[in-house]
């Protein structure tokens, strides 16, 4: 009897996929190298830790965990609708924004379609595209960011969805309001445009696009956001999309009824009103960003100016080697060769002492 091989049974798109490589956990490095103290600057998490208000709310929630969560997420959706000045029927909740991106692809894209995104953009875009069997169309980047003119020209009669990350991960590049608006004007309404704003809160308020307001004018626009970054809930998995109500209606037909658990629903609801926590997170990020960019400039290292909570630094052909050497110094960063950036490392902004640990290790290793 021939040996069973599940790979022979899957759809063609899945055959080409490789498992997503997340940032290395601190516990894994401690086990591997026997290190006591490890600094993780690999996954763009909030270094402040959990909001104290969230901690208190979660403790009160523990007694009810034998019950299923609210499948509709009424209270969280109501709060999000209020903040975004939309109806609750325009909100789709996700188990992190990755879940939202997958729901969008499964809802609108078939194996006969094409999906457009930028080179150096978030790896989940090609992942969800190929999983369906659709054709991924990666448009070459300009200055490490989206070439919106090139993306508009890449549209064909097979295009069904376009992903735009603003700010972009892993490069941190940012698209202006006028550039985005001009792009949306060029895209026909039968193509869904997903504006992934995972790092929205780190963008200065006077530079943020009124993306949710645009949905009235562009009903094919979907705005995706997450609680994993500035709101500090990466481990609880909470995200959402705002869209035209007819789009949200079909998304919620695909969405699993309990895709957000009770703790993530409560945490997301509470942290939205912890304004002091969010402000502190944004200020801490700005200070850390300044420290790292100054270090790069003093060290003669090129970097990509970033609007996120990370900095992608050009370290040369030995990027993978330097990554391994940093691991032995107890510092975890992110190699981005998989994003066609083999000479770069992405460094998350941490606490002041964590940023200093990275700088100290870099000075030791690079002389």
Curated annotation (Swiss-Prot):
**UniProt superkingdom:** Bacteria
Q: Which positions does the record annotate as the modified residue N6-(pyridoxal phosphate)lysine?
A: 229
SUPFAM superfamilies in the record? PLP-dependent transferases
Q: Which reaction does it catalyse?
A: L-histidinol phosphate + 2-oxoglutarate = 3-(imidazol-4-yl)-2-oxopropyl phosphate + L-glutamate
Q: List the disulfide bonds.
A: none
Q: Which gene encodes it?
A: hisC1
Could you tell me which pathway this protein works in?
Answer: Amino-acid biosynthesis; L-histidine biosynthesis; L-histidine from 5-phospho-alpha-D-ribose 1-diphosphate: step 7/9
Residue ranges of coiled coil = none
What are the UniProt keywords, alphabetically?
Answer: Amino-acid biosynthesis, Aminotransferase, Histidine biosynthesis, Pyridoxal phosphate, Transferase
Cofactor(s) listed: pyridoxal 5'-phosphate
The protein, known as: Histidinol-phosphate aminotransferase 1
InterPro entries noted in UniProt: Aminotrans_II_pyridoxalP_BS, Aminotransferase_I/II_large, HisP_aminotrans, HistidinolP_aminotransfase, PyrdxlP-dep_Trfase, PyrdxlP-dep_Trfase_major, PyrdxlP-dep_Trfase_small
In terms of Gene3D superfamilies, this protein maps to:
Aspartate Aminotransferase, domain 1, Type I PLP-dependent aspartate aminotransferase-like (Major domain)
Query: Which biological processes are named by the entry's GO terms?
Result: L-histidine biosynthetic process
**MF (Gene Ontology):** histidinol-phosphate transaminase activity; pyridoxal phosphate binding
Question: Which family is this sequence assigned to?
Answer: Belongs to the class-II pyridoxal-phosphate-dependent aminotransferase family. Histidinol-phosphate aminotransferase subfamily.
What is this enzyme's EC?
2.6.1.9
């Amino acid at each position: 009897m021939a040996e069973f091989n599940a790979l022979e049974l899957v759809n063609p798109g899945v055959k080409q996929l490789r498992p997503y490589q997340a940032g290395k956990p601190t516990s894994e490095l401690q086990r591997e190298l026997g290190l006591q103290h490890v600094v993780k600057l690999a996954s763009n998490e909030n270094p402040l830790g959990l909001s104290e208000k969230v901690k208190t709310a979660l403790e009160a929630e523990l007694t009810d965990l034998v019950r299923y969560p609210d499948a509709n997420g009424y209270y969280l959706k109501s709060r999000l609708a209020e903040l975004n000045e939309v109806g609750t029927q325009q909100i789709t909740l996700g188990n992190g924004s990755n879940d939202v991106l997958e729901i969008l692809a499964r809802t609108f894209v078939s194996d006969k379609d094409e999906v457009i995104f930028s080179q150096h953009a978030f790896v989940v875009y090609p992942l969800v595209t190929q999983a369906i069997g659709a054709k991924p169309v990666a448009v070459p980047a300009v200055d490490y960011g989206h070439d919106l003119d090139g993306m508009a020209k890449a549209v064909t009669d097979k295009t069904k969805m376009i992903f735009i990350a603003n700010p972009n991960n892993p490069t941190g590049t940012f698209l202006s309001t006028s550039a985005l608006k001009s792009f949306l004007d060029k895209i026909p309404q039968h193509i869904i445009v997903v504006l992934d704003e995972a790092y929205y809160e780190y963008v200065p308020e006077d530079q943020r696009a009124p993306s949710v307001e645009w949905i009235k004018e562009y009903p094919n626009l979907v705005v995706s956001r997450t609680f994993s970054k500035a709101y500090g809930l990466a481990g609880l998995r909470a995200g959402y999309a705002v869209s035209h109500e007819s789009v949200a209606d079909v998304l919620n037909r695909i969405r699993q009824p309990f895709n957000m658990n009770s703790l993530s629903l409560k945490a997301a609801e509470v942290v939205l009103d912890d304004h002091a926590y969010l402000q502190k997170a944004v200020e801490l990020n700005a200070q850390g960003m300044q420290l790292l960019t100054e270090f790069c400039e003093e060290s003669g290292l090129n970097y990509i100016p970033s609007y996120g909570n990370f900095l992608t630094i050009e370290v040369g052909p030995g990027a993978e080697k330097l990554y391994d050497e940093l691991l032995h110094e107890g510092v975890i960063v992110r190699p981005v060769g998989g994003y066609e950036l083999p000479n770069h490392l992405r460094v998350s902004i941490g606490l002041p002492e964590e940023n200093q640990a990275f700088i100290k290790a870099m000075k030791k290793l690079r002389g």
